[in-house]
Amino acid sequence: LYVIDHITYYSLDEDSYEKRIEAKRSFVQPNGWGIDYPCLLSPYENVYHEVMFRSDMPELFQLLGESNLTVEIPSVENGHLQMNGKQVRYTSKQQTLPFSNTEQIEVSIPPYTTQRITVLIEYYWFETRYALYAVHPKTGKRRTINGTLQSKMPAAYYITRENIK
């Protein structure tokens, strides 16, 4: 089996990401009282940073075995893709990395109304080509695995409110 030597990403100097917004959850909240009703939300609850490696030759994933498969991946910081020490496992399976923002917000439902509350999450989505360099520890033979890294990283949230009655 081969071991990972290093990985190189090809398009980090470009603004090669885009922002995408997804509805995370939506619910109806009635308020039959004569005062505002406080509704506490955790917008990032069950939100993850999703990462997936695709190889041009998927069978090459098996060259690496199951141990020591950690590589660094880029993320978006200050509006640019850059390396910042974030480590993930090099695998063909989609990974859901914890997103540790526990922020809570309070939404007030006005008296005698019913509102639909929708939590929208904005993600930084990007794809970048990579070359992973591996070496056989006994023979010194080198292999290069080319592919694409896909990443969907939470960036912001928005709350929409619609009066139903």
Language model: regions and residue ranges:
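Polybasic, Ser/Thr-rich amphipathic helices
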Residues: 62-91
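Core pore-forming/fusogenic effector modules of secreted, proteolytically activated toxins
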Residues: 1-60, 88-165
